[in-house]
């Protein structure tokens, strides 16, 4: 098998010199039972995720100085092995400071205590601090040995530090840049090398040369130090290279200057909120349409790495000496749940998919099917209508057009949703058209005009323009349609829409009707769409993921007062001697299920049990 060669240019990431647009989802291995990693990875892949990003929290592995723990759910080597077996790429976020709503941002208490006693200075080039970092990186390298990309392993990316220069770090820019370079050199010396080294770039964070800057955005700010409603977020506008000033506003509010040259990099994200983690004082709920709309606004504005934080929730591991969540008691701004890190995200802490999982999934299918056209496509904003006055503007159409000049085609992105607001319904007509002026491959300016689109309140549209198609061996162009594009599978072109059948139109370059090559799905079916192809010459099979159904179980009774069983889930350390029995009647078709589907869940606070499928 030919080794994949990963690189990047100012337009996109590349694999074997071809543009790619990966989907990356955050999942913390040490916050999830090791026996369920394979199921979690498989379900992430089913959702369209190509790369799993994960923190290595220092405190999870060295709570007491010199006492290292890479066993059980903390076993990084075993997790990387699961990823390799599943064909899932990995982006390791090795810190040494991570945040991630972890105690001390991931620093062990003993290390923090050394700074308090004046023994060292954290997050600097202080030799005493670097001595401990060197050992931490050594331990990570031992775990990752054989799993780096150079060894044909799954690790293709490494993130150094987190929010450095925004949430902590020196105010002196050169000093901060130097420290980032120091950490990278230390990691590489240990064998922690990868095609991509990244650094978070929002809020003025330090991004030296030879680092990829990654950005993010959240639909709300549970870390904000107040409980009043936020102003309408600009994350729901199409803004190329957008910097969400609300990220980490608990550390430094309002910083949004870049320390890197945006012309040298494509727009990459690592922290698009797949949900929101609750805090004690601010328990914000991420509506699924919020998550979908924000993602499409980033994609339409040119994002060429869609990275979610989090994509799969989890549970904080038990600490030997303390609990392991962020808290005010440790000097941080927020109190977080002691155990739950559910994040209200795509795959919840119990492994169940949420509505956001399905809403995003159809866009991931589209991205995978069109990435070679989409990734090099330049972003254009409308030139015949004004930009929205602000995110509170519910009247102005929000749209962006990504045009690939080499292929002479593009995709129109429209978002008519704003969190906790109601946007007006809109009509794009010949009297009120939508116009973009693009520059083609010959340097000539051309107008792209759309004039037959109905935009409902909360609508999110992804419409192809001049799309190259092959039907019965002949090449055509799909000039226009008002149905969102899912992709081409087995020679059939799939679209989805909630418009009435009589209102859907397709305009082909040859003027004919190619209905036999088109399938129009409901939005629901697009979200559940699956295509499996056994071989290159096979037609392939289309199927749908199952919906979640909730049914009331039978009455619970105590069947036996047996012997107590010790478990890590015992509440307050007390064993439970009762054995419970119930009857659950449910029609079950194994072929239709997600691996790891939960068919019965019992939740008693910090104790839980469940029955899962295995396929």
Residues of each region from the PLM?
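N-terminal carbohydrate-binding accessory modules
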Residues: 1-51, 81
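A cross-family glycoside hydrolase active-site/sugar-binding cleft signature
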Residues: 23-28, 55, 91-95, 159-161, ...
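Acidic-and-aromatic substrate-binding clefts and catalytic sites of carbohydrate-active enzymes
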Residues: 29-35, 61-62, 66-73, 166-167, ...
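Aromatic-lined substrate-binding rim segments of carbohydrate-active enzymes
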Residues: 37-105, 109-110, 184-189
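Aromatic- and acidic-residue-enriched carbohydrate-binding clefts of CAZyme catalytic domains
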Residues: 55-60, 64-67, 72, 100-128, ...
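Active-site region of glycoside hydrolase catalytic domains
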Residues: 85-88, 99-247, 253-278, 297-303
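Carbohydrate-binding surfaces of carbohydrate-active enzymes
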Residues: 118, 129-144, 151-156, 160, ...
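Aromatic-lined ligand-binding clefts that engage carbohydrates, nucleic acids, or primary amines
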Residues: 590-615
């Amino acid at each position: 098998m030919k080794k994949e060669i990963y690189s990047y240019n100012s337009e996109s990431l590349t694999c074997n010199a071809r543009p790619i647009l990966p989907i990356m989802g955050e999942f913390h291995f040490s916050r999830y039972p090791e026996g369920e990693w394979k199921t979690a990875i498989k379900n992430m892949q089913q959702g369209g995720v190509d790369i799993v990003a994960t923190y290595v929290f220092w405190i999870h592995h060295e709570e007491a100085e010199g006492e290292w723990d890479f066993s059980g759910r903390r076993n990084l080597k075993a997790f990387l092995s699961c990823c390799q077996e599943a064909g899932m790429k990995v982006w390791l976020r090795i810190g040494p400071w991570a945040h991630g709503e972890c105690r001390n941002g991931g620093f062990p208490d003993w290390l923090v205590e050394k700074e308090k006693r004046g023994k060292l200075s954290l997050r600097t080039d202080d030799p005493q601090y670097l001595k401990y970092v060197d050992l931490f990186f050594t331990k990570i390298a031992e775990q990752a040995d054989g799993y780096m990309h150079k060894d044909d392993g799954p690790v293709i990316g490494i993130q150094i530090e987190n929010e450095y220069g925004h949430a902590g770090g020196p105010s002196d820019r050169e000093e901060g840049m130097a420290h980032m370079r120091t950490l990278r050199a230390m990691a590489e010396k240990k064998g922690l090398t990868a095609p991509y080294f990244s650094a978070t770039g929002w809020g003025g964070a330090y991004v030296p040369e030879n680092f990829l800057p990654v950005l993010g955005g959240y639909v709300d700010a549970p870390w904000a130090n107040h409980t009043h409603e936020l102003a309408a977020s600009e994350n729901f506008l199409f803004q190329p290279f957008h910097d969400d000033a609300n990220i980490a506003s608990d550390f430094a509010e309002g910083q949004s200057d870049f320390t890197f040259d945006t012309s040298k990099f494509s727009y990459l994200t690592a922290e698009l909120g797949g949900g929101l983690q609750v805090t004690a004082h601010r328990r914000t709920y991420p509506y699924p349409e919020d998550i979908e709309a924000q993602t499409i606004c980033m994609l339409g504005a040119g994002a060429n790495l869609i990275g979610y934080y989090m994509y799969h929730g989890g549970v904080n591991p038990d600490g030997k000496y303390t609990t392991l969540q962020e808290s005010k008691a440790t000097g941080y701004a927020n109190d977080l749940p002691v155990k739950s890190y559910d994040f209200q995200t795509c795959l919840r802490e119990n492994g169940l998919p949420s509505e956001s999982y399905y809403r995003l999934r159809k866009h991931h299918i589209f991205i995978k099917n069109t990435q070679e056209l989409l990734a090099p496509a330049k972003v254009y904003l409308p030139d015949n209508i004004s930009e929205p006055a602000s995110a509170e503007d519910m009247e102005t159409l929000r749209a962006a057009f990504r045009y690939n000049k080499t292929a002479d085609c593009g995709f129109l992105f429209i978002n008519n949703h704003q969190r906790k607001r109601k946007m007006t319904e809109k009509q794009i007509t010949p009297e009120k058209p939508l116009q973009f002026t693009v520059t083609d491959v010959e340097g000539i300016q051309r107008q792209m005009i759309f004039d037959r689109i109905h935009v409902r309140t909360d609508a999110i549209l992804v419409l192809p323009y001049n799309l190259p198609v092959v039907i019965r061996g002949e090449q055509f162009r799909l000039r226009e349609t008002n149905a969102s594009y899912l992709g081409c599978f087995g020679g059939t072109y799939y679209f989805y829409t909630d418009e009435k059948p009589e209102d859907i139109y397709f305009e082909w370059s040859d003027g004919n009707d190619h209905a036999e090559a088109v399938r129009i799905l409901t939005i629901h079916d697009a979200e559940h769409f699956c295509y499996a192809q056994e071989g290159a010459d096979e037609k392939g099979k289309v199927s749908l993921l199952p919906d979640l159904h909730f049914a009331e179980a039978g009455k619970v009774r105590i069947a036996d007062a047996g012997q107590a069983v010790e478990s890590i889930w015992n509440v307050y350390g007390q064993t439970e001697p009762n054995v419970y029995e119930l009857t659950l009647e449910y029609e079950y078709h194994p072929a239709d299920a997600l691996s790891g589907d939960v068919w019965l869940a019992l939740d008693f606070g910090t104790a839980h049990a469940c029955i899962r499928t295995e396929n």
